[in-house]
Amino acid sequence: MRKNKYGTYGTFSRSFSRVLAAAFVAAVAAGTMPVYSAYAASPSFARTEEEWAKLRDNVIEYDELEGLIHEYNATVQNNQYTYQKFRQDYGDTNEEVAQEYYKLAQDYYNDMSGDDDASSRMSDLNLQIQGDNMQKQGDETLEDSRIYLLTYEQAEKNLVVTAQSDMISYYENLIQKEQAEATLTEAKENLALAQTKLSAGTITQLDLLTAQENVQTAENNLTQLENTIKNLKENFQVLLGWSYNDSPEIGSLTDVDENEIAAMNPDTDLAQAIENNYTLKINERKLENAKNETVKNQLTTAIANNKKQIGASLSGAYKKVLSAQISLQQAQTKAQLEQTNLSNAALKMAAGN
């Protein structure tokens, strides 16, 4: 996946990566070097050799998704660059950001000519409006580098959740594909039987057409599932840094941890959920930066609503986990019962009963 033709890997700082990327594009355009695959976002010392080896192999494991998103997802890498660019252009604090807006406003004001002809007056009016807008943004801005960082961290966490959901959906669709294949096999067997019965005169032509339609429907369902699996796999691996036409191996899903479920408690977990919530963190930071009393009141209300929503979401998620756990236990019990019935039937058959 990320190995170059010499069998080595590279990780660079973001600033150096951009210099490298510029040289890389120029070299490729000139035809002087082959195209290489994506580099990791973090420098080599950010992880152990063992951790890098797991991320760089051609196997996607469920517990690697967070690391793969952080290192190789294009959106995350772009956000990291944008964050550093924001700090470079505007600074870290809200006051520094406001001052940059004021500087832009002053630049517009300085460009006004003050001439009295119609063209100059129109130009000066436009510059005045743009300068006033910059001045207003400086007065009202709630931004600082911390808010940008939290926003991008939130986006990264959401991408991890998307990757986890995609991997689960991939295996769900594989199971559905197996069921669709079994349905198609049964439909074909029924069609063959129907053809035999039609020849014997025990069914009508309409019955045969129905059997043929069942085969066609089963084939269509299977084709649709195969396309869904193909598209899902391509999008999934691109999300993690592979090309759409690569062929990484997708590892198995992790087993359910019953102890982890047993340790869940919405009441005691609420404080941690509030602490981890990015929307709440961002609004609290905006409140710290707010200067206008109306804005402060709006953010205070939003924060209170955030906390209520976090509690409701946590409780709902906990109930879904318990419901899924019950469904899993029922499915396991049913599978065990079917296995017992199969074993008993085999014993009876062996005994001639």
Positions of PLM-derived features:
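Amphipathic alpha-helical coiled-coil segments
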Residues: 76-79, 81-93, 141, 148, 155, 162-177, 287-290, ...
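Sec-dependent N-terminal signal peptides of Gram-positive bacterial secreted proteins and lipoproteins
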Residues: 2-4, 10-38
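Charged, solvent-exposed structural "stalk/scaffold" segments
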Residues: 79, 86, 137, 175-224, ...
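Short flexible linkers and secondary-structure junctions
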Residues: 3, 8, 41-165
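Short, solvent-exposed, mixed-charge loop/turn linkers that connect secondary-structure elements
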Residues: 226-268
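Soluble, cytosolic/nucleoplasmic coiled-coil alpha-helices used as oligomeric scaffolds and tethers
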Residues: 82, 89, 96, 100-103, ...
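Surface positions of alpha-helical coiled-coils, especially the charged/polar e/g heptad sites
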Residues: 61, 68, 75, 123, ...
